[in-house]
Amino acid sequence: MLQSNEYFSGKVKSIGFTSSSTGRASVGVMAEGEYTFGTAEPEEMTVVSGALKVLLPGTVEWKVYTAGEVFNVPGHSEFHLQVAEPASYLCRYL
């Protein structure tokens, strides 16, 4: 079953799904902007297109991730994103 989600007044949209190859996951698109997300469980984020500038929990320096790159976010934490142009991602819930 697919589950549509919308955040930040429609600037971030995702579709959640479960498959045998990825497990529980979502794919989404982010418009230009700055966002803060909270996690309930660990997440593995893969940038599909564009770039995400990310500030991970416990770090002080922003890092840019581009298409094909992966970053991990601990559960029960917050991470910050800056998006300069529309970008897409795959988020796996670990």
From Swiss-Prot:
Enzyme Commission number, as recorded: 2.4.2.1, 2.4.2.2
Function: Catalyzes the phosphorolysis of diverse nucleosides, yielding D-ribose 1-phosphate and the respective free bases. Can use uridine, adenosine, guanosine, cytidine, thymidine, inosine and xanthosine as substrates. Also catalyzes the reverse reactions.
Entries under PANTHER family matching the protein: PYRIMIDINE/PURINE NUCLEOSIDE PHOSPHORYLASE, PYRIMIDINE_PURINE NUCLEOSIDE PHOSPHORYLASE
Classification via HAMAP family: Nucleos_phosphorylase_PpnP
GO cellular component, one term: cytosol
Gene3D superfamilies for the chain: Jelly Rolls
Top-level taxon: Bacteria
Pfam families, A to Z: Ppnp
SUPFAM superfamilies in the record: RmlC-like cupins
Positions in coiled-coil regions: none
Organism, as annotated: Salmonella typhimurium (strain LT2 / SGSC1412 / ATCC 700720)
Family according to the record: Belongs to the nucleoside phosphorylase PpnP family.
Reaction equation(s) it catalyzes: a purine D-ribonucleoside + phosphate = a purine nucleobase + alpha-D-ribose 1-phosphate; adenosine + phosphate = alpha-D-ribose 1-phosphate + adenine; cytidine + phosphate = cytosine + alpha-D-ribose 1-phosphate; guanosine + phosphate = alpha-D-ribose 1-phosphate + guanine
CDD domains on file: cupin_PpnP-like (cd20296)
Protein name in the entry: Pyrimidine/purine nucleoside phosphorylase
Record's keyword terms, sorted: Glycosyltransferase, Transferase
Enzyme class, broadest EC rank: transferase
Keyword Aminoacyl-tRNA synthetase: no
Example of a GO MF term: guanosine phosphorylase activity
NCBIfam families listed in its UniProt record: PRK10579.1
